[in-house]
């Protein structure tokens, strides 16, 4: 086998075995290894005793996770957390909830991937016998865990109040989920006022997350269906990771609701992972296929979002790149 074929084989093997790595990260997170190590339980023997396993098996797991720089150290000198493993801890701002939800519900959704791509039925529906949002509605604990998972991955939200002027303005966070975007804006701009809309059964996490702001009457939570109506007279309507879950007709209906409800000089702001039409990044197209597996959603190209806004009666004013393959697209009434 020549060098070219060896490189191709190595690349293929790395891709095919990628799931094994993610499963080991999931196991470490489910067992709480990062928290145990932070507390000083840092050897194979003590970790095994803490989780009810065997030192040799824990050693093999930790050896793999150290090799991929999730943790550092060894059983002789003790394991230690890295910036990556700190994200697995059960603390505010970690990725723990995201890793667990991805490693459970979303892992199951990808299992029937071949059947899903052949039939057009999302993998989640094939795995669970119902669509994603029906499952979340039927299982409140899963709904809560999903919102916490989404909260963990909202790395772009703290950029929004820096890029948009919220001084003395009112905004509507449509489908605001955990309330993390609303919280970021209100903490950054004391004169702003917010309304967060989501399904009635989904407001519990946001209520906890925004408790101090609710007490100060700077924000109100509204339960309802965004495809029926949205709160009126807002200056800014935020659609963060919403239209990726919606088909064309539903997206246009939502944009129409926002256009009808907003103040005269209002803006709609789409915050969405978009795909470059000319050079799609690996992560953006991976997220796109994941959206199909989860809920029959899709990530559009930036040009497709601009076109969608135009057909919804809006003219795009600016497009800003954000972290994690995300773009902010600001539009006014056309």
UniProtKB/Swiss-Prot annotation:
It comes from the Bacteria. Keywords: Methyltransferase, S-adenosyl-L-methionine, Transferase. Its EC number is 2.1.1.327. GO terms for molecular function: 5-methyl-phenazine-1-carboxylate N-methyltransferase activity; identical protein binding; O-methyltransferase activity; protein homodimerization activity; S-adenosyl-L-methionine binding; S-adenosylmethionine-dependent methyltransferase activity. GO terms for biological process: methylation; pyocyanine biosynthetic process. Pfam families: Dimerisation, Methyltransf_2. SUPFAM superfamilies: S-adenosyl-L-methionine-dependent methyltransferases, Winged helix' DNA-binding domain. Belongs to the class I-like SAM-binding methyltransferase superfamily. Cation-independent O-methyltransferase family. Contains an N-terminal dimerization domain. The C-terminal region contains the S-adenosyl-L-methionine binding site. This is Phenazine-1-carboxylate N-methyltransferase. It comes from Pseudomonas aeruginosa (strain ATCC 15692 / DSM 22644 / CIP 104116 / JCM 14847 / LMG 12228 / 1C / PRS 101 / PAO1). The gene is phzM.
């Amino acid at each position: 086998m020549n060098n070219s074929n060896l490189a191709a084989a190595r690349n293929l093997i790395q891709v095919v075995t990628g799931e094994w790595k993610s499963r080991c990260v999931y196991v470490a997170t489910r067992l709480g290894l990062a928290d145990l190590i932070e507390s000083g339980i840092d050897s194979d023997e003590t970790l095994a005793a803490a989780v009810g396993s065997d030192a040799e098996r824990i050693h093999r797991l930790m050896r793999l996770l150290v090799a991929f720089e999730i943790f550092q150290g060894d059983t002789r000198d003790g394991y230690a957390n890295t910036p990556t493993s700190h994200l697995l801890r059960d603390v505010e701002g970690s990725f723990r909830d995201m890793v667990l939800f991805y490693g459970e519900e979303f892992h199951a959704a990808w299992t029937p991937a071949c059947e899903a791509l052949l039939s057009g039925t999302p993998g989640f529906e094939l795995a669970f016998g119902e669509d994603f949002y029906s499952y979340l509605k039927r299982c409140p604990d899963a709904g809560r865990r999903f919102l916490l998972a989404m909260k963990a991955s909202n790395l772009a939200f703290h950029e929004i109040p820096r890029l948009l002027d919220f001084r003395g303005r009112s905004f509507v966070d449509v489908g605001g989920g955990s309330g993390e975007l609303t919280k970021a804006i209100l903490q950054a701009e004391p004169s702003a006022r917010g309304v967060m809309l989501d399904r009635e059964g989904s407001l519990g996490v946001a209520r906890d997350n925004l408790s101090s702001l609710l007490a100060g009457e700077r924000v109100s939570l509204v339960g309802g269906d965004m495809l029926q109506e949205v709160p009126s007279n807002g200056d800014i309507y935020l659609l963060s990771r919403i239209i990726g879950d919606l088909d064309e007709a539903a997206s246009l209906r939502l944009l129409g609701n926002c256009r009808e409800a907003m103040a005269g000089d209002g803006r709609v702001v789409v915050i969405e992972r978009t795909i470059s039409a000319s050079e799609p990044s690996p992560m953006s197209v991976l997220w796109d296929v994941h959206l199909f597996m989860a809920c029959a959603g899709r990530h559009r190209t930036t040009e497709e979002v601009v076109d969608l806004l135009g057909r919804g009666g809006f003219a795009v004013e600016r497009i800003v790149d954000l972290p994690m393959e995300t773009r902010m697209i600001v539009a006014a009434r056309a």
